[in-house]
């Protein structure tokens, strides 16, 4: 299996990368974006993902992890890019509180691949030519979620595509209108 690790807060880019990974047949290994290098090293070695899509504020941490884990490429996500235009413009105003908020949300991430470049024409198109992975079915792994490690080292729990679809069906039956 091909694995892609992800350490992102809730943001539109998070969903986009999940859909893209699954379209390619990759398994998404989710990580808490607030974890330290020590907390991430074991899980990163366990699933051996070569690509990490991460919040740009923590990109240096994953660049450091690339020295001791299989990470080969780090894609950095600027969360401000997906905000509505009014909010993006407001964050550019020279007001102290807005500058502090901007610094909380974004940091330069040299040496990484900016997420925005993945959406550019120079990357080879809009992805319409990518075919679904023929080997993916309801029993194929979709995600690896790691336990907290309260009784030892964190362990990776696999969710299959069937597990995820069952969760969607459950949600739709409990909440009308979705």
Feature names for model-found ranges:
Residues 23-119:
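Structural core segment of the AMP-binding/adenylate-forming
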Residues 7, 52-55, 137:
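Active-site-adjacent beta-strand anchor residues
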Residues 8-19, 34-38:
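Conserved coil-to-alpha-helix start sites within the AMP-binding
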Residues 99-102, 106-146, 153, 177-178:
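Conserved pre-ATP/AMP-binding loop-to-beta segment of ANL
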Residues 27, 44-56, 142-145, 153-178:
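AMP-binding/adenylate-forming
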Residues 17-22, 28, 164:
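Short hydrophobic alpha-helical segments of the AMP-binding
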Residues 2-3:
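Short, small-residue-biased leader/transition segments that mark boundaries at the very start
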Residues 11-12, 37, 59, 151, ...:
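Alpha-helix N-cap/helix-start and coil->helix boundary motif
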